[in-house]
Amino acid sequence: MAILFGPPATAEEVTPAAVWHPGPGSLASVRAGCADLGGKELGDCFAAAMAKAGASRAAVGFAQRFEGIAYIDALDRDVARPVAIAHVFFPYRANENSAWFLVNGMPELIDVDDRRYLAVDALERAPGYRALLRRYPELTLWPGLRGSTGPQPVSRSHGGERFTIGYRLRDLCHACAVVGHVRFAFDFDRSGKFLSTRLVSMTPVR
């Protein structure tokens, strides 16, 4: 399985004010101006360049939660529901630049590609997965498409909401063949408290 990493903790509500839409050429200019730096210097440089390029204080504040190396480019929010979907862009990643985060619940930020939140044990017990693993011994789990259309929340029968997210099974590497598709459901209670993640389906590519 590929190991997927999550964000640092935070306690601030994410609102539309935290969204940043760089103007034409702005992002390329910001990236180029900080590209020779690393670590904290890179983060500080990128956050400062965001502010100079017109990003709001909330947008810069969100970037600083990720040590200045990510920003929100869209927020799917229903005021009637506690949990929103933040579309987060990582400009310095080589791959998987776009990510989805479930925000404003408890915990406040959940990276849907963070392995700690995924029902990996249930996936590995699934007969279809075990059969696929016999065919592809180097099978790894990767994020699915994290595009501009985020997952739509569905009300749970006992209250709260569910977000169903798609993933890909690959024959080892990021550029290797997709050999299966997985869906996990993230469940929250009425207050936005994260309950658990469930395996919804595992489908091999035929």
Segments from the language model and where they lie:
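Boundary at the C-terminal end of the N-terminal hydrophobic targeting segment
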Residues: 9-11
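Acidic, glycine-rich flexible loop segments
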Residues: 129-179
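Bacterial N-terminal signal peptides
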Residues: 1-4
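Short acidic-glycine loop/turn motifs at beta-strand connectors
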Residues: 189-191
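Extended, low-hydrophobicity segments enriched in charged/polar residues
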Residues: 14-145
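Short, solvent-exposed aromatic-acidic interface loops
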Residues: 169-170, 197-206
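Short, surface-exposed coil-to-beta transition loops
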Residues: 94-98, 149, 177-184
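Secreted/processed peptides and extracellular or luminal domains of membrane proteins
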Residues: 40-41, 50-52, 155, 179-183
